[in-house]
């Protein structure tokens, strides 16, 4: 409130993926692709590119988007609603993961053996916009391997992207 009263907007940051040992994953196991013992079956990362011959193996468990869809994305809505009580705009790290994400079998030592998997994209952001009842105050971190479908998703919802001068 103090910053807003001074004409300053705050930009928050939210990663798309959760750490495997986070309370979010532990308390909401059905929302993630985990086995019966709670271990990930697939994990997040990015494919090989000109920065890394083996890609990036982040190791975060991936979402069970079917379950999220069944709940109307309730977990995500709560997460974003709360974050927006702390800031005016929210930068989503790895926005491209809402269009397609790189799924790597759990236990791999590199990201080479991953594959692109479709994410809910338009359905997710349509639900988010309808539920929150206003234009989304989201900044899409659209760096890295970005294809036309990621740009179309970003533009469909009027979300600003990012440019890093160094690149």
Functional labels for PLM-detected ranges:
Residues 1, 18-167:
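Alpha-amylase-like alpha-glycosidases and glucanotransferases acting on alpha-linked glucans and related
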Residues 1-18:
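Conserved, well-ordered alpha-helix/loop/beta-strand core segments that scaffold catalytic motifs
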């Amino acid at each position: 409130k103090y910053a807003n009263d001074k004409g300053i907007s705050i930009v928050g940051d939210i990663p798309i993926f959760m750490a495997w040992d986070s309370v979010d994953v532990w308390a909401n196991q059905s929302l993630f692709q985990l086995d019966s013992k709670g271990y990930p079956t697939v994990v997040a990362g990015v494919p090989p590119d000109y920065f890394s011959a083996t890609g990036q193996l982040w190791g975060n468990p991936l979402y069970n988007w079917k379950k999220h869809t069944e709940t109307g994305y309730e977990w995500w809505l709560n997460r974003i609603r709360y974050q927006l009580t702390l800031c005016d705009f929210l930068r989503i790290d790895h926005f491209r993961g809402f269009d397609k994400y790189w799924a790597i079998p759990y236990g791999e030592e590199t990201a080479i053996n991953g594959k692109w998997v479709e994410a809910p994209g338009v359905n997710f952001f349509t639900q988010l916009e309808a539920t929150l009842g206003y234009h989304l105050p989201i900044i899409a971190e659209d760096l890295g391997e970005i294809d036309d479908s990621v740009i179309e998703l970003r533009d469909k919802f009027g979300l600003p992207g990012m440019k890093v001068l160094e690149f």
